[in-house]
From Swiss-Prot:
One of its GO terms (cellular component) is extracellular space. The lineage of its organism: Eukaryota, Metazoa, Ecdysozoa, Arthropoda, Hexapoda. Residues 1-30 form the signal peptide. This is OMEGA-myrmeciitoxin(02)-Mc1a. GO terms for molecular function: epidermal growth factor receptor binding; growth factor activity; toxin activity.
Length: 79
């Protein structure tokens, strides 16, 4: 399965000698396979993927099958 769970990371680069602040948004992937599988009441949360439970935030997250993306692996991917 392709790991499509994406976190947004903000990176700040300061060029103080020019008094310019550059802010860029980058996509960061998380290794969901390190998290436990979702409990039975959430086993169908991911439409086309595998549900993992993020214990630190108490939320489910999906590892999408190839060809799918989105929070619940519900969107076809053209990648």
């Amino acid at each position: 399965m392709k790991n499509n769970y994406i976190n947004t990371c903000v990176v700040y680069l300061m060029a103080t000698f020019l008094l310019i602040s550059l802010i860029s948004i980058k996509k960061c992937t998380a290794d969901l396979s390190a998290h436990p599988l979702c409990p039975d009441n959430l086993k169908d949360y991911c439409i086309h993927g595998e549900c993992h439970f993020l214990e630190d935030v108490q939320e489910p997250a999906c590892l999408c099958e190839t060809g799918y993306r989105g929070k619940r692996c519900h969107e076809l991917s053209m990648d």
